[in-house]
């Protein structure tokens, strides 16, 4: 997350963002697991506060703010599959109300060994061991491809030299009917 945020601001020629907004489905799971394990192991006694600080969901956003010495708006959304969309919507609202000129917005998540095992056993992940890369996403098997990573974008209310894209809009959709969801995606494309 830190490197991704540095790359985004460097490419946008932004020295210090006015706001930092991060979306994460689950936060820093490995650090949370470590903290809770130590809490149990030491019977809630003799714990360093650092372990707790690193286990909170806003750890990445706060580390980025410290790095940039940014004392402005800083928020983290933990809305599972809608986290990045929520962060992006917040960024666009800040820009629209002219509360910020440049907003660093990103999404980040990690997969832990325990988390992967649980999700895999529940059938959420595809078995990718026998699939070739070129057919991986066209395969009609059940589940998703497990992944983790970070992506950050420097978003501005005005076009700047080197701009890569324009955000035409954000729409968060929720469907219970698969056919309705497919039709809506076709309309957007």
Q: Over which residues does each language-model region extend?
A:
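Conserved beta-ketoacyl condensing-enzyme motif
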Residues: 1-63, 67-68, 109-111, 189
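Short, surface-exposed, charged loop/turn segments at secondary-structure junctions
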Residues: 34-39, 115-127
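Flexible, glycine/proline-enriched loop segments at strand-loop-helix junctions
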Residues: 47-52, 74-82, 141-142
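Glycine-rich anion/phosphate-binding loop at the beta-strand->alpha-helix junction
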Residues: 101, 107-112, 117-120
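Condensing-enzyme catalytic core mediating Claisen C-C bond formation in acyl metabolism
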Residues: 120-189
């Amino acid at each position: 997350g830190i490197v991704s945020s540095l790359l985004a601001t460097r490419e946008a020629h932004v020295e210090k963002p006015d706001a930092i907004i991060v979306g994460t489905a689950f936060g820093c799971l490995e650090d949370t697991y470590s903290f809770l394990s130590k809490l149990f192991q030491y019977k809630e006694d003799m714990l360093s506060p650092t372990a707790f600080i690193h286990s909170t969901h806003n750890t990445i956003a706060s580390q980025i703010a410290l790095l940039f010495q940014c004392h402005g708006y800083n928020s983290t959304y933990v809305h599972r599959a809608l986290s990045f969309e929520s962060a992006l919507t917040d960024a666009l609202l800040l820009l629209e109300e002219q509360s910020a000129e440049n907003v660093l917005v990103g999404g980040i998540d990690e997969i832990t060994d325990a988390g992967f095992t649980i999700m895999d056993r529940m059938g959420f992940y595809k078995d990718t061991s026998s699939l070739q890369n070129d057919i991986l996403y066209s395969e009609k098997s059940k589940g998703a491809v497990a992944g983790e990573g970070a992506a950050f974008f420097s978003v501005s209310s005005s076009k700047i030299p080197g701009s890569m894209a324009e955000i035409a809009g954000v729409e968060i959709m929720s469907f219970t009917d698969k056919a309705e969801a497919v039709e809506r995606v076709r309309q957007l494309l």
